[in-house]
Regions:
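Post-DEXD/H (motif II) to motif III coupling segment of the RecA-like Helicase ATP-binding lobe
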Residues: 104-161
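Conserved interdomain linker/interface between the two RecA-like ATPase lobes of SF2 helicase motors
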Residues: 148-197
Length: 203
């Protein structure tokens, strides 16, 4: 599901850039920025800027000042503090894993929720907001089910990517027939061995 969501997000970013507008892409924690950065850099190159608190103050000031000019990044990927960066023409705000409590700034002041701040920021620019999650927060669920937010559910694989095969296993029945020797079914163990055993050319 996450891979589908990432592909959907990438398409929305491309669409926004074609309109000549900027994108703010928020992640709940710095640890996630590395893997997302690698993927986005391959597609968007130098149009992508990274911003978070692990950067030295001088580097963050440089990014801030660059965003005030025509040479500012088209895409900013960052954590909650990125909502305070200046933008010329913001067109899309993405809050990935919007349910995460790390979007809340508790200490030091100012105390704020980056997801909520991002929604307000988007409205100030007339930009779209995309909240991504497999497990919506109570507030987002309420807003989506009452029609305040639009709701897109990925029930099928995005762009016809093949679904994995799901095989139900009756554990109770296996216990009854005394075919369970541990925590895992014989079928699961069989597949584990199949995919972890070295191939003949690796031996």
């Amino acid at each position: 599901v996450r891979r589908q969501r990432q592909m959907c997000i990438r398409d929305r970013i491309e669409e926004t850039l074609r309109q000549g507008r900027q994108v703010l892409y928020l992640l709940p924690e710095i640890a996630l920025t590395t893997q997302i950065t690698e993927r986005l850099k391959r597609v968007f190159g130098s149009r992508l800027g990274i911003y978070h608190s692990k950067f030295p103050d001088a580097e963050r000031v440089e990014i801030w000042q660059k965003q005030l000019t025509e040479e500012g990044y088209d895409i900013i990927l960052g954590v909650r503090s990125s909502v305070f960066l200046p933008f010329r023409n913001l067109g899309l705000v993405i809050v990935d894993e919007e349910h995460e409590n790390t979007y809340k700034q508790q200490d030091p002041a100012p105390r704020y929720h980056a997801r909520n701040a991002a929604i307000v920021l988007a409205s100030m620019y007339g930009a779209k907001t995309l909240l991504g999650t497999a497990t919506p927060s109570v507030e987002t669920w309420q807003n989506a089910t009452t029609g305040k937010f639009g709701w897109v559910e990925l029930k099928e694989r995005y762009k016809e990517i093949q679904l994995p095969e799901i095989i139900p296993v009756d554990i109770k029945e296996l216990h009854r027939k005394k075919r369970m020797t541990g925590q895992f079914s014989p079928l699961l163990l069989q597949y584990c061995l199949l995919y972890t055993s070295p191939s003949p050319r690796d031996r």
